């Protein structure tokens, strides 16, 4: 996180992951496959600006990107990439903060996770026990925080 100018904060991160199963007793049939839920590229960017117009107001947002990945050990289930946008505004009083948030601004439908061992099957070669979890829709949140 850095401050390009006073009251403006910007942060970013990115990751590149090149993962694959190696031949082993448990995962021999999947050697060379990508493990489930591992995106090759991920990244985040966020920013906020405070004291807008001299008011105790901070606004900001974030963008998150997750690349395509697989939802199973055999690499038969494709999970599409997705990009999420979140926004917030916070008004700060003497002993309180009032915050409004919008999560998933564009109402993106995506799969954040696949559970390979959903049925608690102990055999790693069992590939049909997947549970695919769908994303939450666009959500609005309002919170109040008090300091006593």
Language model segments and positions:
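Gram-negative outer-membrane beta-barrel transporters
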Residues: 1-73, 143-147
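Short, low-complexity, polar/charged sequence segments that are solvent-exposed and flexible
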Residues: 30-31, 78-82, 117-121
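Short, solvent-exposed micro-motifs at the edges of structured domains
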Residues: 30-31, 85, 101-103
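C-terminal beta-signal and adjacent terminal beta-strands/loops
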Residues: 65-72, 91-148
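Generic hydrophobic alpha-helical membrane-segment signal
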Residues: 1, 43, 74-76, 89-92, ...
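Residues that define the transmembrane beta-barrel architecture of outer-membrane proteins
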Residues: 33, 37-43, 81-85, 94, ...
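Outer-membrane beta-barrel proteins
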Residues: 31-35, 49, 75-77, 88, ...
């Amino acid at each position: 996180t850095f401050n390009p100018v006073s009251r403006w904060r910007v942060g970013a991160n990115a990751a590149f992951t090149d993962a694959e199963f190696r031949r082993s007793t448990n995962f021999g049939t999947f050697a060379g496959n990508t493990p489930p839920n591992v995106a090759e590229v991920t990244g985040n960017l966020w920013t906020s600006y405070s004291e807008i117009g001299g008011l105790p107001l901070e606004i900001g947002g974030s963008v998150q990107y997750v690349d395509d990945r697989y939802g199973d050990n055999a690499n038969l289930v494709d999970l599409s990439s997705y990009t999420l946008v979140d926004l917030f505004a916070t008004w700060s009083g003497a002993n309180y903060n009032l915050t409004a948030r919008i999560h998933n601004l564009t109402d993106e439908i995506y799969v954040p996770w696949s559970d390979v061992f959903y049925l608690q099957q102990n055999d790693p070669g069992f590939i049909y026990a997947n549970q695919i979890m769908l994303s939450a829709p666009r959500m609005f949140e309002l919170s109040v925080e008090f300091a006593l």
